[in-house]
């Protein structure tokens, strides 16, 4: 009798603790503080990321991007291709301008407004307006960004990145693998160092995923006794969905439709045309299976 009572008590305590854990997490507080030319983001006082928009940078970007363990999952100023800045949005070859790498004089995406519009609650919302400009040439594009940060579970931090690109003139973007939303993993999590890169069909590595359309790609690896990674998802409402991916085993991945234009030369846009793109980033513990990346994509795809 005592044994039965003891087992019931243990079960009750376990359920209670699980409920308390869920309730505690459902009260997640995400906070942003604007400090000079960056916005720092914390999740329950845990430092998650900064959104950087300094005037001496090529474009605004997120860095660091910390996983649930506290370690960063992305890299910036890496020895191989140092212009890859963690998690970012840009493009090369826009009306002859370069809004991706090299000197600022060749092109720069400059922030003109950064506003925290929802703060200190279960979700954080940042709005950011940008102008694509370079000296001695008219600006070809302005963009409007909405960044929403949530934490669905203690093991997943989520960034929703929505951007509307408005063409201020007729725009030609020459065929380029340097375009749109991109992530650069920390080398220790890359395929080159034993990590995994996998798409929605289970295809792995640069060899399998390069140039292949897929709704999402997840990159993760093991450091010490912990596995962490980052997935990028494309929303089905996006132009070119599902866009083919530009991938590298050293840790770069980007859904890059502009590298595969219909005429194999350029993608054209008319003045006044607007392109709206939505991406979801999941920074997670565990593998693509334990983080249920496929299931998380279904949730994302169901959202309007």
PLM segments and residue spans:
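Beta-strand-rich N-terminal accessory domains
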Residues: 27-82, 286-288, 294
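Beta-strand elements of well-folded, non-transmembrane domains
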Residues: 69, 130-134, 147-151, 165-169, ...
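Extended, loop-rich substrate-binding clefts of extracytoplasmic carbohydrate-active enzymes
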Residues: 86-155
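Beta-strand-rich recognition/accessory modules
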Residues: 231-304
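Sec-dependent N-terminal signal peptides
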Residues: 12-22
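Acidic (Asp/Glu-rich), glycine- and aromatic
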Residues: 54-57, 61-64, 152-197
């Amino acid at each position: 009798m005592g044994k039965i009572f003891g087992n019931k008590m243990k079960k009750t305590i376990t359920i209670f603790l699980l409920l308390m854990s869920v309730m505690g997490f459902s009260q997640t507080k995400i906070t942003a503080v604007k400090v000079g030319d960056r916005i720092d983001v914390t999740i329950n006082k845990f430092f998650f990321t900064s959104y950087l928009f300094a005037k001496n940078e090529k474009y605004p970007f997120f860095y660091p991007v910390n996983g649930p363990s506290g370690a960063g999952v992305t890299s910036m100023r890496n020895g191989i291709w140092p212009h890859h800045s963690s998690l970012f949005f840009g493009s090369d070859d826009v009306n002859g301008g370069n809004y991706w790498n090299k000197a600022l004089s060749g092109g720069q995406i400059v922030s003109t407004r950064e506003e925290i519009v929802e703060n200190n609650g279960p979700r954080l919302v940042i709005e950011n307006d940008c102008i694509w400009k370079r000296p001695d040439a008219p600006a070809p594009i302005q963009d409007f960004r909405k960044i929403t940060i949530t934490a669905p579970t203690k093991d997943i931090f989520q960034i929703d990145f929505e951007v509307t690109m408005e063409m201020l003139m007729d725009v030609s973007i020459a065929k380029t693998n340097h375009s749109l939303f991109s992530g650069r993993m920390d080398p220790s999590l890359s395929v080159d160092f034993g990590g995994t890169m996998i798409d929605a069909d289970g295809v792995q590595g640069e060899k399998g995923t390069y140039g292949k359309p897929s709704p999402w790609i997840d990159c993760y690896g093991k450091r010490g006794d912990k596995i962490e990674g980052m997935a990028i998802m494309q929303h089905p409402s996006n132009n070119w969905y599902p866009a083919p991916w530009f991938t590298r085993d050293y840790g770069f991945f980007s859904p890059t439709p502009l590298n595969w234009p219909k005429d194999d030369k350029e993608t054209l846009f008319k003045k006044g045309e607007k392109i709206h793109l939505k991406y979801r980033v999941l920074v997670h513990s565990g593998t693509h299976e334990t983080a249920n990346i496929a299931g998380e994509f279904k949730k994302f795809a169901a959202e309007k």
